[in-house]
Amino acid sequence: MWKVRGSSSVKYKSKSLFRFLPLILLVGMAFCPRVQSSQANVAYFAGGCFWCTEAVFQQAPGVTSVVSGYMQKAETVQVTFDPAKTTYDKLLNLFWRAHDPTEVDAQGPDTGKQYRSALFFVDEQQHLAAEKSKAQAQKSYSKSIATEITRAGSFRPAPENHQNFCRKNPNNPYVRQIIEPKLKKLGLKKP
């Protein structure tokens, strides 16, 4: 409120600061460092048995850790990555190549809803990237992609005997017959 001068009585004129709000926000955004969500470096992928998915993402450049677990009753891997060395888009590309996204509630010999294909996004940027990459990946398949794309919920790590399964169990028949051929097809080495 402003006092109007030259008046015998005190009058106040209301000036709204709201008209300056866009300018204030723009100036603030220009001079303040951009804050990234701590979740921006985390991605969740469900591509069948988490032993396979874990082994694939452990070989991806820029990935700093992979944890096998469960999200929304699907075997899922939590992938932490360094955005200076890789991008979510590159990880999505690897995800599509690492499994058959047209299979419903199954991957290879593993069947059941827990083996479904799913992408769990942590923010709107990941959501948009996942939808875009799914549309792009669909061009490579004659059948419809069954991968669900949904907001990430609570992630529950699997017991320790499921973590780093391929590294800990290199002679396991599942590793030899399922994981190793998958890694070879992708041009990746066994972890």
Predicted segments with their positions:
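N-terminal secretory signal peptides that target proteins for export/translocation
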Residues: 1-15
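Flexible coil/turn and secondary-structure edge motifs
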Residues: 2, 31-191
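Bacterial N-terminal signal peptides
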Residues: 11-12, 19-30
